[in-house]
């Protein structure tokens, strides 16, 4: 059982996933700090010194902190846009690599076709008497 677990845990995609989760968590903290400590205070300043983190209203005994919700939405938008940019870049690189591979295959195919024609001509010359 231990060997099975070790084989499972050491598979490349599991390790990649673990690394992605750790980096993603750290990136999330950076974005949260960016939004809470830099972007939202600047937006609040532009809106007349409004502090979004303190925006709330009470409904009976319940306190609805919609300012915190707004900050979370901004976090989400920044993270989503960042992921979009990374995926877009990776897809572009992948398409470029595939195009290069296709071009290389076409070059090999053209070369192969030329070699076949030469072979056929040589066979034809060998069969025909001089």
Swiss-Prot record:
Cellular localization per UniProt: Cell membrane
Keywords: Cell membrane, Ion channel, Ion transport, Membrane, Transmembrane, Transmembrane helix, Transport
One GO term (biological process): monoatomic ion transport
Positions on the Extracellular side per record topology: 44-65
Signal peptide: none
GO MF entries: mechanosensitive monoatomic ion channel activity
Coiled-coil residue spans: none
Residues in compartment: Cytoplasmic: 1-14, 86-130
Topological category with respect to the lipid bilayer: Multi-pass membrane protein
Transmembrane helix found in the keyword field: yes
One Gene Ontology term, aspect cellular component: plasma membrane
Main localization (coarse): membrane
TM regions (residue ranges): 15-43, 66-85
Protein family: Belongs to the MscL family.
HAMAP family from the UniProt entry: MscL (MF_00115)
Chain's role: Channel that opens in response to stretch forces in the membrane lipid bilayer. Forms a nonselective ion channel with a conductance of about 4 nanosiemens. May participate in the regulation of osmotic pressure changes within the cell.
Description of how the protein assembles with itself and partners: Homopentamer.
PANTHER family named in the record: LARGE-CONDUCTANCE MECHANOSENSITIVE CHANNEL, MECHANOSENSITIVE CHANNEL MSCL
Protein name as it appears in the record: Large-conductance mechanosensitive channel
Species in which this protein is naturally found: Bacillus subtilis (strain 168)
Gene that this sequence comes from: mscL
